[in-house]
Structure formats: C-alpha cells, structure tokens
Amino acid sequence: MTEWWKKAVVYQIYPRSFYDTNGDGIGDLRGIMDKLDYLKTLGIDCIWISPVYDSPQDDNGYDIRDYRKIDKMFGTNEDMDRLLDEAHARGIKIVMDLVVNHTSDEHAWFVESRKSKDNPYRDFYFWKDPKPDGTPPNNWGSMFSGSAWEYDETTGQYYLHYFSKKQPDLNWENEKVRKEIYDMMKFWMDKGVDGWRMDVIGSISKFLDFPDYELPEGQKYGIGKYHANGPRLHAFIQEMNREVLSKYDCMTVGEAIGSDVEIARKYTGPDRHELNMIFNFEHMDVDTKPGSPAGKWALKPFDLVELKQILSRWQYELADTGWNALYFENHDQARVVSRWGNDTTYRAECAKAFATILHGLKGTPFIYQGEEIGMVNADLELEEYDDIEIRNAYQELVMENQIMSKDEFLTAVRKKGRDNARTPMQWDGSFNAGFTTGTPWLKVNSRYSEINVAKALQEPDSIFYYYQSLIKLRHSYDVFTDGRYELLMPDHPHLYVYTRENESEKLLVAANLSENTVSFDQPDDNWKLLLGNYEDTGTSTLFRPYEAAIYYLEK
C-alpha cells in the first residue's frame, strides 16, 4: 500500500451547492463531472464528496435511507460510476462520505426496528424504556438541540439519536450491523472509490450504562464526554481496518469530535492500524466562549496566539506518529476570511495569508469549494437560512430559553453558521452566479459578481492562482511533506511564523494575520522567496496587512 495521501491536496465538494446541470436549483454529479477540468487546473489530487446517497434530506444527506443508491436529486448510480472513471482518467482520486453513526429513520433497517420489540432489526438501534415518570432514559442532549431520545408510541420505548430525531444511532455492538457496513464499504470500493471521510466516527461506540451528565441548574440536557470516545471505539475501527480498509490502497480521514492529541495518536499511529488522519476541532473553537449555555454561538474575538498554540501542539505531538488533516473551512464551518480575517478591503491578501499558513503545515491540506476564490460568508436574514442546526438552535436559545436575543443570535449565525459555507458556488458574474438556470436551493451570495471563478481565472494574481502555486510547491518540495515543524515568535499577536526542516531543505513560512503593518526581519540572501502575496514581498523589513511569504533554503 502506498501513502499517496501524504503528498495529496484534497478538495471538498458539497454537491448540492457545487454546479447544477438540470436546472432544478440543486447541484448534481454531472455538475461535478463538468468541472473536473477546472479542478485539474487548480492542481488538486483528490476530491472528497459530501453524501450523495438516497436520503430524505433532513440533514442535507447525512440522514441516509439507502447506502448503495445515489439520490435521484444528484443523479444515478451510473452517473457515479462515470464520475469515478472521468476523475481517474485525469489522475484525480475520489473519497466518499461514510455516515455510519446513524441512518435515516426511513432506512429499511429502522422501519423494521420500530415495528416491535422482538423484530430481528430491533437491536440494530438503541431502544430504552422511559424513566418511571415517562421522561427519556437519561439527560443526553442532541447536537441539534433538545433530548437525544425520541419516544416512539408503537412500542412505548425511546430510541437514541445524537443528531436529529430522523437520524437514529446505529448499534455498533451488534455484529450484524458492522457486517452490513463493511459489505457496503466494499461495494463502493470495488467500484473504484479511493477512500472515506468518516462522519462523526468518534461517536460509534456508546457508553452502554448510559450515565447521566452532571448539569448546572436550569440546563436540561448535556453534550460532552459521553457523546464520543466510547470504550470499544478503537476496537471497532481496527476491525474495520482489518476487514475492509487494509485490502485497498485508500485514504481515510475521521471526523473525531472531542479528540485531543492523545486520542488522535490512537486513531492515526501507524502501528495501530486504524485511520490515516483525523479532523480535530480544537482550532475551530478559538472564537467560541467556553462554558456558555449558548455553545458554539457564544462568540469571542479571534486570538491568533491561541490559534498558534493549538496548531503547534498538534504539529509537535503528531510529528513522529500519526498525521494531521489540515483545514480552516468545510461544509460545517464558515468562510475563514469573514470569520477570522477581513472580507472587504484585504479580502484577497487575507485569503492568501490563511492559505499560506495552512498549506505550509505538515499534514494533508483540505480546500473547501469556493475557498480557492476567497468566497465570503452569506448575508442572509434569519428566515433565509436552511440549516437544521440553525433552525433548532434559534428555537432553543432564543424562543424557548431566552439565552440570546434574536439580534445576538443572528450576529453569531452570520459569523459561524454552517450555511455560510453552503451558498452556491460562484462560477461567473451571470444570474445566480452561473450555478443554476433555476431557483437555487439556498440564496446565492450577493457578492458573486465581484467574487467568481471566471473572474479569478482572468486575473494572474488571483487567489485561485495563488492556491495553484501553493499546490505546485507541495508537490515539488519534499520538505512540505516530511519537514519538522518549529514555531517562532509564539507570543506575537499578529505574526504567525514557523519553519519546516528536513535533512536537505528548510522552509520559513510567515504571515501577518492582521490589518496592522508590523516589522518583520527578512531572512538573509541565502534564502529564496518561493511565494508571496504582495507583488514586492520580501523587499522590506515591514509586513503589510495580511502579507505572507514562503522562503526556501537548500542546506
């Protein structure tokens, strides 16, 4: 087996927002096929496609009704086969989303499971009796607000759902469940799928005594340590590796909620035979006020020193065992220029600066669609958001418990809401940004005439071509893959500076992640400037707002 993923740059596609070829307002698989040459021009090696399986779309496809069938909204199984062929013909690999913590409540297994207590599929899911007073079995909360338990009148029991009530959690303790999942994985990998991004994989093992959380007064439900990293998690993943993954030359990345560096080592240490890498969430919480009942919606100002500390800890701790998945954006996170940077005056410089920092790190970088043209957060009104997380949080935090005012909540959503990343891809300056000839499923960002692919391809100094250059550098110099990381100037409030070094090469990566001009000592003449985001980068002892550079030294 090769470790092709160590040199790869991955591009995430959220299909419903990527490109629509049939005018129904929803992106589709043929839309991805139509844009493969664009992605080849960008230079990426691999595409991760968010779920396209048959689904009622309660949580935009993360509620799966049939794992082996493509949803007609996106196309057909034949379209998927053709997409694999077309991508592979261009040297691009395809990774699919593996959503196996839960299914849809419309999946055949759950339809059977809820019929009776002695149904053969009953223990494919978690069913529990109510407490004597009729309330849920414990005080676990759903990630989408409310209780993690839903009462079902047919049998008088509750079923467990960490997400929406239409997403019942699978019982991984049941060997039949695991075999069904492994068979499904082989079905897709035998068609040519090159790997998996594993949705909330850290939650598949449950604490089977279902202990209550200790909660502060006034709080009804808890979300925390019992929602992830259960006792058999690593045994399950090792079994999956043994039964399926080890038989294919594939890439695996796990979404590991609640993981620290120690847990990451367990997932990704080569001798553990589990996954190649995981997405951690620690760095994405630098703008979240800890311990607030408002959760992710409790904002605090972006703190670069804290971001450097977190990213550096993950770089140091996984240096010799394991691997980092590098990202600032995905379908669950807002646009980085709007969230942590400047999306107006310095939008281009800012987008390039954050890209420089991320792509210089050790690990596999993930680019989310639109990130390569500097797309910005949505400018929607509350009623225009589609996301179930936003709608449920508004109900709980504003309407029911008055934890936030409507204005406070809208401010937080405009900063961090998932729909900021889900507005349609901006292809050109025409109506609906060239995404669809119909009515888009989510409103197109109003700045599409200023920010779009066609414009970016015409401008030699665009964000797109900067990303293209970064990807070429990662492919050209081994030090990007294997160089040891060292953080410099850890306490500087505006500069992020680090080195990467192997036996024969050294990089110096520097970025001013602020709107201030700051002093920065250029390295001596032995260093070569590989890339900078101002025309004359490297000629002054000052770093202008969001200025960034990568320098190279051959030892």
Curated annotation (Swiss-Prot):
**Record-annotated active site:** 199, 255
Q: What is its EC number?
A: 3.2.1.10
Q: Does the keyword Transferase apply?
A: no
**Alphabetized UniProt keyword annotations:** Cytoplasm, Glycosidase, Hydrolase
- Cytoplasm: present as a keyword of the record? yes
> Where is this chain's protein located in or outside the cell?
Cytoplasm
Q: Name one GO molecular function term.
A: oligo-1,6-glucosidase activity
Q: Which GO biological process categories is it annotated with?
A: oligosaccharide catabolic process
Q: Which domain of life is it from?
A: Bacteria
InterPro entries, per database record: Glyco_hydro_13_cat_dom (IPR006047), Glyco_hydro_b (IPR013780), Glycoside_hydrolase_SF (IPR017853), Malt_amylase-like_C (IPR032091), O16G_dom_2 (IPR045857)
Q: Which Gene3D superfamilies match?
A: Glycosidases (3.20.20.80), Golgi alpha-mannosidase II (2.60.40.1180), Oligo-1,6-glucosidase, Domain 2 (3.90.400.10)
- Site, Transition state stabilizer: residue positions: 332
GO CC terms: cytoplasm
Question: Coiled-coil annotation: which residues?
Answer: none
The cross-references to Pfam families, in alphabetical order and at most eight, read: Alpha-amylase, Malt_amylase_C
- List the catalytic activities from the record: Hydrolysis of (1->6)-alpha-D-glucosidic linkages in some oligosaccharides produced from starch and glycogen by alpha-amylase, and in isomaltose
NCBIfam families cross-referenced by the UniProt entry = PRK10933.1
Q: Which family does it belong to?
A: Belongs to the glycosyl hydrolase 13 family.
Q: What is this protein called?
A: Oligo-1,6-glucosidase
Species of provenance: Heyndrickxia coagulans (Weizmannia coagulans)
